[in-house]
UniProtKB/Swiss-Prot annotation:
It comes from Drimys granadensis. CDD domains: S14_ClpP_2. This is ATP-dependent Clp protease proteolytic subunit. Coiled coil: none annotated. One of its GO terms (cellular component) is endopeptidase Clp complex. PROSITE patterns: CLP_PROTEASE_HIS (PS00382), CLP_PROTEASE_SER (PS00381).
Length: 202
């Protein structure tokens, strides 16, 4: 039986009594954001809205985006990435569990020097795939052209943000490339592998 989203007590400044809010609402108030599902338009719009709102509220405090995602749709993922580059606060990205496909693209989009993976996290990069294999031929050709443009965009970002040469990223994107946290660090996707039990996210 599902338990739903856990609730935690929260006391607003100046209020005597605490109110019960869902745990994510409470964490958002501390500027902690979560991508714990496939990337789609709904979660993309939620994260974009939260990043913009929290930036307006205080543009000097960093944001923290925790990622455990198998990937998902390319355009919603690019929307999250672009927003991370646009908002004034630095966005830390933290990989826990898995950051695959668009999950790894969002991970690499964190502020350089502030991208972290938990010790047992996994990262996977590959090229974008089409979901319209049964479309009429004309539509399929247009889809293929668009996919090529998207692949070029993703490749360019990986090259820029990892420091790897174009040929390395191009080869990596030909197939599914899975990495451990330390391999992702060596590859330039994350900057730091978390040390267990430090209790410090800064």
């Amino acid at each position: 039986m599902p338990i739903g989203v856990p609730k935690v007590p929260f006391r607003s400044p100046g209020e005597e009594d605490a109110v019960w809010v869902d745990v994510y609402n409470r964490l958002h108030r501390e500027r902690l954001l979560f991508l714990g599902q496939e990337v789609d338009s709904e979660i993309s719009n939620q994260l974009v809205g939260l990043m913009v709102y929290l930036s307006i509220e205080d543009d000097t405090r960093d944001l923290y985006l925790f990622i455990n995602s198998p990937g998902g749709w390319v355009i919603p993922g690019i929307a999250i990435y672009d927003t991370m580059q646009f908002v004034p606060p630095d966005v830390h990205t933290i990989c826990m569990g898995l950051a695959a496909s668009m999950g790894s693209f969002i991970l690499v989009g964190g502020e350089i020097t502030k991208r972290l993976a938990f010790p047992h996290a996994r990262v996977m990069i590959h090229q974008p795939a089409s979901s319209f294999y049964e479309a009429p031929t004309g539509e399929f050709i247009l889809e293929a052209e668009e996919l090529l443009k998207l692949r070029e965009t993703l490749t360019r970002v990986y090259v820029q943000r990892t420091g790897n040469p174009l040929w390395v990223i191009s080869e990596d994107m030909e197939r599914d490339v899975f990495m451990s946290a330390t391999e992702a660090q060596a590859h330039g996707i994350v900057d730091v592998v978390a040390v267990e039990n430090t209790g410090d996210f800064t």
